Design a protein with these regions (language model features):
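Alpha-helical transmembrane segments and membrane-interface helix-loop junctions
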Residues: 1-179
């Protein structure tokens, strides 16, 4: 189990670093948005490239932020059954949900979005807007984000199995109050 826990830790570290970068992307997206608006109103100049850059940063935040958010146990959840389960039952529910729903869905979506990226890359797809950006790099973010979320799912499965075997103590409880 130790090698698997080491793998889990490595995945967690990667997603923590991604989350750290995403924190700065929020600030960068806000600065780009505000600067673009101020320049447009002050000087009458606007750039589709800056607007698209802002969209790209938000897309990166969503796609890569999902794995970081999952690692931090901060995804929105419906706790109809979860609240009534013991801690062990919650671990089992997390394990089953991740193994049979999250990971397969992420891998399927990564697989289905890969040709979308490859086609854009093959033709060197550009924005249809004047002054717009290259499109294929942001299209790569879609399958990459789903792969990172699936990898975080693998990490969570490893941790849940270790916790069920008594080899690891994790706080699987969602810290926000339920409504």
């Amino acid at each position: 189990m130790r090698p698997l826990l080491a793998l889990s830790t490595a995945i967690d570290v990667i997603n923590e670093k991604i989350g750290y970068i995403c924190n700065f992307l929020v600030l960068a997206a806000c600065i780009v948005s505000a600067a673009n608006a101020m320049i447009r109103y002050a000087f009458g100049y606007s750039s589709n490239g800056w607007l698209e850059l802002q969209w790209y940063m938000f897309a990166i935040l969503v796609m890569f932020g999902a794995s970081y958010t999952f690692k931090r146990n901060e995804h929105v959840r419906v706790e109809i059954f979860y609240l009534f389960l013991s801690e062990r039952g919650q671990l089992w529910l997390d394990l089953i949900g991740t193994l049979f729903f999250l990971i397969p869905a992420c891998l399927l979506l990564a697989y289905l979005s890969w040709p979308f990226f490859m086609q854009a890359y093959a033709v060197g797809e550009m924005s249809g807007n004047a002054g717009g950006l290259v499109r294929w790099p942001i299209k790569f973010v879609i399958p990459a984000g789903f792969v990172m979320l699936a990898l975080q799912g693998v990490s969570e499965v490893i941790k849940r199995i270790a916790a069920l075997q008594g080899e690891l103590t994790i706080d699987a409880k969602y810290e926000r109050p339920t409504q």
